[in-house]
């Protein structure tokens, strides 16, 4: 306890000097060794015993994580490291590598300024490595590289000294190629990783040693000595001479930015307010005396303290009893406690200044992505965009009717804790639908509802979430209000792919300045008139008001858009979410008396015009795809390719390395249920595989009627396919 207390004192002493702080994330593909690396960094800081490091998985504090051997949630910890005679505070977040939990990585990247990208020396860069690197660069988070499992390269692949260096060099080149391809401007500004400079370290997290060029100069240990130690399997001596925590933490302190250096560039990317305003200037210098600007990146439940909101404090200081505004809430919230994380433990402190990662209780209105501030009316931070979308859904029911009210509350809570989860109540069937990133994601959530929340549930087998879109143009189509006093005339057409890409990458939103948005839309191919007339963006769909001088339209527009968003959430063909739909309001006739153009009149008229127009414009379904990467011995290759091709999959590429073949393929998500067991059988358990979200592609016409009818029956709709006339006012 004494050691822990001493650590807290050191942490709080360093908190108030942003120059001595490094906020970092550890990111990688699944099983490349992130959590083992984190544990050894903690052991080096004296926070867990060296004997248990790498085996304790301190950062995987959840029972499910220990059982499955994977990281599911991001874990935070603050620790102290001495570099060149000075103490530094490292706020570290260990993130998941499994594609189903990629949302945690995205959110963690908003909280940190630098990332240690971990790569397995044998496997090299894998799909999730690319995804997390792209996410880091998008959030202006600077990377350094740790090549792990170098001992495997030497002892399992039996490479010699020279070949080892060639292979490691190729790996570094590949990472730099990725960085350059994703953000050339940053690459040219010095964000490439370079072993000679010191932004790359090599080692073994499991055996607790690491080496880098600065470390070699410091210790006098050469590459050939490292090779010999590994050959002789004398990892203990290597760990004594070149302790992992020293090489990696030195690299973090020297090459990753402090909050002061980082926030100058980062604030512009994640906040669209006026940078010359008081709060804009305070955030760019991490001013602890300024107004509070705190972004929530994670919400978890504490059995004693309730909801804990964790996030990054960009300016001001947080302390107990403070009244703050939460974006989207009408009343202020009172902070009850502030603290820092030590793995599973949250330690209370009196106050936390700007530049730190803080854990706060009492923010009852907070949600992931919320802006918390002492400044009323502050422009909120840019919302957090996730790389993948929820593509698998299950229906959830309480086993016992008495638990139904509790289940409703629990589902609200888990959706708040994990924003990549979408919870909806199916009005027709009364079922609660839970949509997530994949089978494993939903399995883990269902297990937690039972284990942590104490509600017994039953779930249906997983189903795929499709997308509705249109391939043609239709309109103007008239929509009449039930009282016949209001009429709307709309045209629908496919939204330009370039505009969809801008929306998907979060490069345009209705919150950005109009002139900036208009310029971006025109550059993406819209004419000036359309670029000026966009009035709403919902998911990857857009609504344009092309009318001129219509009386009462302004005060009715909110209701018209409500009709639009209702259709985009549940399209006319099968009540699946819509994507890539462009709706243009060409004309409108409105009753002069506001009583006759209320929500019950305007919303149905707006909705039905769009529904009918979409069915006239060849409404169709797109299905989600995943890329599937398989590593398999050559003699098992046939079984693996057959398994993919038997699931409507296609082989994109095949490469061989030694006696191993790497297969890159893609297949529809609907065909990949049960793939884990089948690929094991097909390859005698010798295949290693991973997946990555690959977007949506048209559902083959041969399957369309069967799939649409199946979805409609499941949702309690008429099995017969709808016609435009069904939605047109008589």
From Swiss-Prot:
PROSITE patterns tied to this protein: G_TR_1, G_TR_2
Location in the cell: Cytoplasm
GO annotations of cellular component type: cytosol; ribonucleoprotein complex
Chief location: cytoplasm
Keywords: Cytoplasm, Elongation factor, GTP-binding, Nucleotide-binding, Protein biosynthesis
CDD domains: aeEF2_snRNP_like_IV (cd01681), EF2 (cd01885), EF2_II (cd16268), EF2_snRNP_III (cd16261), Elongation_Factor_C (cd01514)
HAMAP family: EF_G_EF_2_A
Family note: Belongs to the TRAFAC class translation factor GTPase superfamily. Classic translation factor GTPase family. EF-G/EF-2 subfamily.
Name of the protein this chain belongs to: Elongation factor 2
Gene name of the record: fusA
């Amino acid at each position: 306890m004494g050691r822990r207390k001493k650590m807290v004192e050191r942490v709080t002493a360093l908190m108030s000097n942003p120059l001595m702080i490094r906020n970092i994330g550890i990111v990688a593909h699944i099983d490349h060794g992130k959590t083992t690396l984190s544990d050894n960094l903690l052991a080096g800081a004296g926070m867990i015993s060296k004997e248990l490091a790498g085996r304790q998985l301190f950062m995987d504090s959840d029972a499910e994580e220990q059982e499955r051997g994977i990281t599911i949630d991001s874990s935070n910890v603050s620790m102290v490291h001495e570099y060149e005679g000075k103490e530094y505070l490292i706020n570290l977040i260990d993130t998941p590598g499994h594609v189903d939990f990629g949302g945690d990585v995205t959110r963690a990247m908003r909280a940190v300024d630098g990332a240690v990208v971990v790569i397995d020396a044998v496997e090299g860069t894998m799909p999730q490595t690319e995804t997390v690197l792209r996410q880091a660069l998008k959030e202006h988070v600077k990377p350094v590289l740790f090549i792990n499992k170098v001992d495997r390269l030497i002892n399992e692949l039996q490479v010699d000294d020279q070949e080892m260096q060639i292979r490691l060099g190729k790996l570094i080149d590949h990472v730099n190629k990725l960085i350059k391809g994703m953000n050339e401007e940053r690459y040219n500004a010095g964000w490439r990783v370079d072993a000679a400079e010191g932004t790359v370290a090599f080692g073994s997290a499991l055996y607790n040693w690491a080496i880098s060029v600065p470390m070699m100069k410091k210790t006098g240990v050469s590459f050939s000595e490292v090779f010999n130690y590994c050959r002789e399997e004398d990892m203990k001596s290597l760990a004594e001479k070149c302790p992992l925590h020293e090489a990696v933490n030195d690299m973090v302190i020297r090459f990753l930015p402090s909050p002061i250096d980082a926030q100058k560039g980062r604030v512009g990317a994640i906040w669209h307010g006026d940078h010359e305003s008081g709060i804009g200037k305070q955030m760019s210098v991490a001013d602890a005396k300024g107004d509070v600007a705190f972004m929530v990146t994670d919400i978890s439940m504490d059995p004693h303290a309730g909801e804990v909101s964790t996030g990054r404090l960009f300016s001001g200081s947080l302390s107990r009893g403070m009244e703050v505004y939460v974006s989207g809430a009408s009343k202020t919230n009172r902070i009850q406690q502030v603290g820092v994380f030590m793995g599973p433990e949250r330690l209370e402190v009196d106050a936390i200044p700007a530049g730190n990662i803080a854990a706060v209780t009492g923010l009852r209105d907070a949600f992931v992505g919320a802006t918390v501030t002492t400044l009323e009316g502050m422009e909120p931070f840019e919302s957090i965009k996730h790389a993948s979308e929820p593509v698998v859904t299950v229906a959830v029911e309480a086993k016992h009717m008495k638990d139904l009210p509790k289940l409703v509350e629990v589902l609200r809570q888990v959706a708040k804790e994990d924003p990549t989860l979408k919870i909806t109540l199916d009005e027709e069937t009364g079922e609660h639908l839970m949509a997530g990133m994949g089978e494993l994601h939903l399995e883990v959530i269902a297990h937690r509802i039972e284990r942590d929340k104490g509600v017994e549930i039953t779930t249906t087998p997983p189903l795929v979430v499709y997308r509705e879109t249109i391939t043609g143009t239709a309109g103007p189509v008239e929509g009449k209000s039930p009282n016949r006093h209001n009429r709307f005339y709309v045209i629908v057409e496919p939204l330009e792919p370039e505009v969809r890409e801008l929306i998907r990458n979060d490069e345009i939103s209705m919150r950005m300045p109009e002139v900036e948005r208009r310029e971006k839309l025109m550059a993406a191919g819209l004419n000036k008139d359309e670029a000026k007339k966009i009035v709403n963006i919902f998911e990857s769909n857009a609504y344009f008001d092309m009318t001129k001088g219509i009386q009462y339209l302004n005060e009715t527009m909110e209701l018209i858009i409500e009709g639009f968003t209702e259709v985009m959430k549940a399209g006319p063909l099968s009540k699946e979410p819509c994507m890539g739909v462009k709706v243009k309001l060409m004309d409108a006739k409105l009753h002069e008396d506001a009583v006759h153009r209320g929500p019950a009149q305007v919303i149905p008229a707006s909705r039905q015009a769009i529904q009918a127009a979409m069915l006239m414009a060849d409404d169709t379904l797109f299905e989600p795809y995943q890329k599937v990467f398989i590593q398999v011995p050559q003699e098992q290759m046939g079984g693996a390719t057959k398994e993919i091709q038997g699931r409507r999959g296609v082989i994109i590429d095949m490469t061989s390395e030694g006696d191993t073949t790497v297969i890159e393929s893609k297949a529809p998500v609907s065909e990949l249920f049960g793939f884990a067991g089948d690929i094991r059988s097909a390859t005698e358990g010798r295949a290693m595989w991973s997946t990555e979200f690959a977007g949506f592609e048209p559902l083959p016409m041969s399957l369309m009627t069967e799939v649409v009818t199946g979805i409609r029956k499941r949702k309690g709709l008429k099995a017969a396919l709808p016609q435009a006339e069904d939605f047109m006012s008589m």
